[in-house]
Amino acid sequence: MAKKAATKTPKYRDRSLPIPRRVADLLRRMTLEEKIGQLTQELAWKAFTNKNGRIEVSDDFRKILSGNGLGSLYGVLRADPWTGVTLDSGIGPREGAEAVNAIQRFAIENTRLGIPLIFNEECSHGHMAIGGTVFPVPICAASTWNPALVQKMTAAVAAETRAQGCTQTCSPVLDVVRDPRWGRTEETFGEDPYLVSRMGVAAVTGLQGKRLNSTGSIIATIKHFAAHGWPEGGHNAYPPHVGPRELRELCLAPFEACIKAGAQSVMSSYNELDGMPCSCHKGLLTGVLRDEWGFEGYVVSDMGSIKVIWQDHHAADDVAHAGARALDAGVDAEMSGGGYSQESIKLALQRGQITEELVDRAVRRILRLKFVLGLFEKPYCDVDRVEQV
């Protein structure tokens, strides 16, 4: 009787290989549709259902996944008036971990290559989920002038968040505030670029820990890049009026400090700088961030900020063109909006506005972090550990 041929383990599954080799092996196996899937970060507080304590993947998520996979999900456990999730309708920490595991398992088992998801959550001053510890808002934390305390606080936030299977946060906010009328001032570390830098580095260090594949570490996303905290009239997302020296010395200084400290994600902002929307500002996203500072992580857009390039800034012909401009500039993942949808990316490729190499570049950066996080080896969290944390 003939012996069944042994199935050879793909190189990207071999944890003994260097991460760049694993990324390269996985990337060459991917179809264009699977690559585009990795560029998307979908809103996901409706990705599961809770029927009398039974957690299941929702029909909405099944449709979104569509066989091509996704790069990441945003706000699976987010509970606040904006999502409509309340103490009555939401779920606690243990059930939250079960929900994240269920979604992750479905994504791995129902896609060809089984690429795990990154779960991105809001953690400005605690995991914005039911049962998360609530700490003082950043403006209050900065008032302590105690970076060591902020590092300890954010390490606790990271431990709670990772215990529920979530691996990234949309914080810290590094906007330097010079107009108290701006409605997001409490999210920041204040008006002084040196203090913002020191507190930002402390937060990044606390969130990311020594190794991103440890049980108490998550990716820190520094935001909003750039000059988002100085809007005209204090109106959110309005243009800032800053010159090149002010931009460098005041607005960019905290970002540079946090990149040097190892921050692995940057969020591009809604606003424009001197007429150029920040989410397609190649001089910032590639020239400064990568060429000058040596950033190796991935850039994610603020929610809908790529679509805003077209709709509000009128700097693109349509949403597909906006997506092409953002991808070329250096935005690797889109948080909602349609600029990086299957239809938009394919249309931009057809028009010659982007090349598949640009798609590969972004996917490569995202996959690298999934390997750094250890998600291919350990995609699920230990539900029993949640209550211990």
Language model features with spans:
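Glycoside hydrolase catalytic-domain context in secreted enzymes
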Residues: 1-389
